[in-house]
Curated annotation (Swiss-Prot):
The family this protein is said to belong to: Belongs to the dynein light chain Tctex-type family.
Known partners and oligomeric status: Interacts with ZMYND10.
Gene Ontology BP, a term: microtubule-based movement
Taxonomic source organism: Homo sapiens
GO CC terms: cytoplasm; cytoplasmic dynein complex
The protein, known as: Dynein light chain Tctex-type 5
Signal peptide extent: none
One matching Pfam family: Tctex-1
Length: 179
């Protein structure tokens, strides 16, 4: 089977067009030449898209089922937390004298211990905020205030005030229900 010069030109022109394939694609080309003439040629082109960031993000997110629970099944145990506050603050500060550096460190330590003991109660879906203030007891007055936006049906707090001969301490635990 002989090809005319015109048909050879069209085949060569068609082959040149197929040669411009993007570097992202996979292509193969086979050609057999016998005595300088093209005997058979075949070309396949496949294309693969690059994965986009949007595809990766949609695969990584985990959808959780709605619980349709609007309030806590078990309310925050304020009385139990009051006992924890009293025990921890009293045990740490009963015999201490006021020293600024020591009290600065004690506020951090006491708040971490209180938070750990309240978390051990395993009350689900409550966010805990623990704040401890320690100051020198020297015939001065102090006003400590806190403000928060919360639901009075489910959110609550617990507070304890401690005094000895040289210092005072105020420990607060705020419990905010996560819906």
């Amino acid at each position: 089977m002989m090809m005319s010069d015109n048909a050879k030109g069209r085949a060569a022109h068609s082959w040149k067009k197929r040669g411009s394939i993007s570097s992202l694609s996979n292509h193969e080309f086979w050609r057999k030449e016998i005595h300088g003439r093209i005997k058979d040629s075949m070309s396949t082109v496949s294309y693969m898209e690059e994965p986009s960031q949007r595809d990766d993000i949609s695969r990584l997110t985990v959808q959780m089922e709605n619980t349709y629970q609007l309030g806590p099944p078990k309310h925050f145990p304020v009385v139990t937390v009051n006992h924890i506050l009293k025990d921890v603050v009293t045990s740490y500060l009963q015999v201490e004298e006021y020293e600024p550096e020591l009290c600065r460190q004690m506020t951090k330590t006491i708040s971490e211990v209180i938070k750990a003991q309240v978390k051990d109660l395993m009350i689900p879906r409550y966010k805990l905020i623990v704040i401890v203030h320690i100051g020198q007891l020297n015939r001065q007055s102090i006003l400590i205030g806190s403000r928060c936006l919360w639901d009075p049906k489910s959110d609550t707090f617990s507070s304890y005030v401690f005094r000895n001969s040289s210092l005072f301490a105020l420990a607060n635990v705020y419990a905010v229900y996560l819906e």
